[in-house]
Design a protein with these regions (language model features):
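Histidine-centered active-site microenvironments of extracellular/periplasmic hydrolases
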Residues: 255-285
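Feature for exported/extracytoplasmic and membrane-associated proteins, marking the mature portion
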Residues: 1-238, 273-277, 285-347
Length: 347
């Protein structure tokens, strides 16, 4: 299984030429790093230089930077390249109210904000609650991709109801933080452990665009990175042995400026960090080339430069973990999708 998560910024104001340190609020990642399940890819991002959130996110989720005409998402194309004649309706799951750009395409995907409501909610008679839940979702959806997966979604409703999502206790004392992100990952863990045939899942965490009073040690960024790392760590603990066959990748549309602005915040930047976590991951290591933070090394004199294309990281996960060998169709025009260019963060 592969989990794709959309996040935003990770940065350390104490990073120097010779060393880099993480934020104190990311301490939940320390055991995963020590166990060599967690790896870092620094200075990763898109080669496109847009500073627009909308355009940058669209490029990252379509997997075609600089091309606005792409209709489907990279993760959907990846699944399309894997023949699964008896695929589960839960093959591709997104936690949220709509199918994200990443999963848009010909392969059916299911979006849900809450698996309990998805399974038992509805507007009609109690005896037909699941059917009514699906009908309500179908009528309210404005996403043509979701409309095209009606039969699959209806089957998913029936399967999920039989899994009894109301009764779930995270394993091994996994403690998910309060908030939508932690709740999303808890529900993904439920789906995976219910053996419903999940192959890929998507969750996101927003609220990172801090141009004012950012607070990397105490404040907005500290709070978000704490929630981010604690939720992922809890998810990993909750999966137990299933984590050995799981790869989690975090990504964002861009990073932030290398220096603080006049309002104690940071502005839209270029390179960012990607975290990869899982049983197959060769963790406890940092991958990629560090470009440096000296004035002459910054992109356009203000941002961390991109030295690893985000598609390199994703290509390796898709090829070596999911078994997709036709990466040219997943990332058209991207030359470094060839296995010879992999970072080799997977064992």
């Amino acid at each position: 299984m592969m989990i794709a998560e959309r996040t935003c910024r990770f940065a350390s104001e104490s990073a120097t030429e010779s060393s880099a340190s993480s934020l104190p609020s990311l301490t939940a990642f320390k055991p995963l790093w020590d166990q060599k399940h967690l790896a870092i890819v620094h200075a990763a991002g898109s080669p496109d230089n847009t500073r627009s959130h909308f355009d940058a996110q669209d490029y990252m989720e379509s997997g075609t930077p600089g091309v606005k005409s792409t209709e489907d998402g990279w993760l959907n194309r990846a699944l399309a390249g894997l023949k699964e004649p008896d695929a589960s309706p839960f093959r591709a799951v997104a936690m949220g109210g709509a199918v994200p750009r990443t999963l848009a395409g010909t392969v059916p995907a299911v979006a849900m904000s809450d698996i309990r409501g998805f399974a038992v909610g509805g507007r009609g008679p109690a005896g037909n609650a699941a059917s009514n839940s699906f009908e309500a979702m179908y009528e309210q959806s404005v996403d043509s991709v979701l409309h095209g997966t009606g039969n699959e979604t209806f089957e998913a409703v029936k399967m999920l109801k039989s899994a009894d999502p109301e009764k779930y206790t995270p394993a091994a004392g996994a403690d998910y933080p309060r908030g939508r992100f932690g709740d999303s990952l808890r529900q993904v863990a439920q789906l995976v452990k219910a053996n419903l045939g999940v192959e890929v899942a998507f969750a996101d965490i927003g609220g990172w665009d801090h141009h004012v009073n950012e607070g990397s040690v105490q404040g907005q960024i500290a709070n978000l990175t704490k929630e981010f790392s604690q939720a992922i760590a809890a998810f990993w603990i909750d999966l137990g042995d299933l984590g050995e066959d799981t790869v989690i990748v975090t990504m964002s549309e861009f990073g932030r400026t290398a220096r603080e602005n006049g309002n104690r915040g940071t502005d839209h930047g270029h390179a960012n960090v990607m975290f990869v976590l899982g049983g197959p991951v060769k963790g406890g290591r940092v991958y990629g080339r560090w470009p440096g933070l000296q004035p002459g090394q910054l992109y356009e004199g203000r941002d961390l430069a991109v030295t690893t294309d985000f598609r390199q990281v994703l290509s390796e996960a898709l090829n070596r973990h999911l078994g997709n060998s036709n990466l040219a169709k997943v990332f058209p025009g991207f030359e470094k999708s060839d296995p010879r260019n992999f970072l080799r963060y997977l064992g």
